Amino acid sequence: MKKRIKELTDLLNRYRYDYYTKDAPSVSDSDYDKLYRELVTLEQSYPEYVLQDSPTQQVGGTILKGFEKYRHQYPLFSLQDAFSREELDAFDKRVKAEFPNATYLAELKIDGLSISLSYENGFLQVGATRGDGNIGENITENIKKIKDIPHQLSEPLTITVRGEAYMSRQSFKAINEARQENGETEFANPRNAAAGTLRQLDTAVVAKRELATFLYQEASPTARNQQNEVLAELADLGFSVNPYYQLTSSMDEIWDFIKTIEAKRDQLAYDIDGVVIKVNSLAMQEELGFTVKAPRWAIAYKFPAEEKEAEILSVDWTVGRTGVVTPTANLTPVQLAGTTVSRATLHNVDYIAEKDIRIGDTVIVYKAGDIIPAVLNVVMSKRNQQEVMLIPKLCPSCGSELVHFEDEVALRCINPLCPSLIQRSLEHFASRDAMNITGLGPAIVEKLFLAGFVHDVADIYQLTKENFMQLDGIKEKSADKLLAAIEASKSNSAEKLLFGLGIRHIGSKVSRLILEVYGDISALLTAKEEEIARIDGLGSTIAQSLTQYFEQKTAAILVDELKTAGVNMHYSGQKVNSDAALFGLTVVLTGKLNQLNRNEAKDKLEALGAKVTGSVSKKTDLVIAGSDAGSKLEKAKSLGIRIEDEDWLRQL
């Protein structure tokens, strides 16, 4: 029986590969079902012989208790967006300045959810969401319910791959029809449906909803040399790979490809929102490297957003956590990109003045980045003596006079005691990407603030069960859960705390970069601006903002209060040694290395505190030159930059 189970498993997996990956069914549905039922019967009789890659393991359901956090071995970066031909040409110019012979691979940008799949010896071990790029959620059991994801690769490789999980338009339509019949809320669009499906705790629901995938990247080291070779290998391994892509060195040809795809966008079985252009050479990708947020070797062209007309009924002004006052238009409802839109951002006062936006105007509304509704323009032909927009002079929350700094486009409330500013700061501190205090959302924060229980983030750690029980709608069980979540947040790594403080220009990724060097929040109280500016990926604006914040006496008091409350101040990741031999130096690798491969050399340089970049400029401090070094070496010589060889690096 063991042998027959193995035969059936291999045979059915091959048929699945032919059907889902090659789009070339090699067996009839009835024959497949007959073999499948035979395998099910045998596995039920001999459960000890069920194989890890059995197709039966992708059906049925398990109720999951929740999703564990998963730290990605290889971080997932966002892509720089482009919305015009000019931006693509600028990208091309930057790349060709370093690599005149570079070619590009243009691929479809699937409108789905990023996933990471890790295999050991050919077997699927972990499927995870993108999360913040460093930490996602382990959704392996749900991933296994997606039919075109192989449980076992065609080769026994240990590999991590990346791609998009999506829901086809046909599946989306069927699901919404069923939800409508059952009186359930319909999904807004296929992407939302796919996102909700991947986070289902009932795996049977995941299997029933028929998600699909396209894989496009090997995140782990690969023997391939080109991105198009990676796609071919992924297909050979059993993954679904999108068939639409273009290899070229010409931005004109890429633009033609974009326009061709845009024209046939509605004919595809799935949603796309653009085209991703990547440098095809993996070696060139490595040399070009990354910014803090995105690779320098890729760019995502986003299709123009859908636009609709709507009337502005009124405008609300709200205060954010940094004091910025943002105008939001209340609109006559319109259907836009699959959702009903009745509110749209007006950005800031300068934007309102520039566009001459008025109450009662008919305006063009679109979704910026296909996400945030925004007002694009006024339809002047439909204007009929509308009232001029009244720009507030006083804060809508605290009544303080608003300021409009010369170098800013927004109005700002600078009253540190402004109720809205404090509430937004508390909400941000408790948010998922910051201290992740589950349950402490805007509604409860508002109740706590109005009750006088919290005035700054340190007060959160002084809350008692009695405080929560005094709030309307909070029962004992909810209070216990909130207190447990607050207590759990104390052990977060310090970059979560730094981000949670809401310092201007200090995002989650920047917080991690800072703490990798300083290691402890307390060290930032005396950090020097010039030292911070030298950290890879930062600069003078971020450094100035950080030092100005921690120079305030209130910052030292707040840090002390948080420390006294037991909040962790230490960074739990790997710390960069500021005393390292090359700390703060910008280094470029060029030419062929004989003893170290490029990854090893880069890792060593970064371990020594260096920032490794792909291009030589006046900011470069050192060039490590291997054999056959070309234009970068010549440029370094012309700029008088220090040059060393591989042997020098190995001896450090």
UniProtKB/Swiss-Prot annotation:
Example GO biological process: DNA replication
Residues binding NAD(+): 29-33, 78-79, 107, 130, 164, 278, 302
GO molecular function, one term: metal ion binding
Cofactors, names only: Mg(2+); Mn(2+)
Positions that bind Zn(2+): 395, 398, 413, 418
Active site: 109 (n6-amp-lysine intermediate)
Entry GO CC: cytosol
Start and end residues of each BRCT domain: 577-652
Reactions that this protein is recorded to catalyse: NAD(+) + (deoxyribonucleotide)n-3'-hydroxyl + 5'-phospho-(deoxyribonucleotide)m = (deoxyribonucleotide)n+m + AMP + beta-nicotinamide D-nucleotide
Enzyme class: ligase
Keyword match Metal-binding: yes
UniProt keyword terms in alphabetical order: DNA damage, DNA repair, DNA replication, Ligase, Magnesium, Manganese, Metal-binding, NAD, Zinc
EC number, as in UniProt: 6.5.1.2
InterPro entries per the UniProt record, alphabetical: BRCT_dom, BRCT_dom_sf, DisA/LigA_HHH, DNA_ligase, DNA_ligase_AS, DNA_ligase_CS, DNAligase_adenylation, DNAligase_N
One Pfam family here: HHH_5
Described purpose of this protein according to its UniProt entry: DNA ligase that catalyzes the formation of phosphodiester linkages between 5'-phosphoryl and 3'-hydroxyl groups in double-stranded DNA using NAD as a coenzyme and as the energy source for the reaction. It is essential for DNA replication and repair of damaged DNA.
UniProt record similarity statement: Belongs to the NAD-dependent DNA ligase family. LigA subfamily.
The name this protein goes by in its record: DNA ligase
Organism, scientific name: Streptococcus pyogenes serotype M49 (strain NZ131)
Taxonomic lineage of the native organism: Bacteria, Bacillati, Bacillota, Bacilli, Lactobacillales
Gene name of the encoded protein: ligA
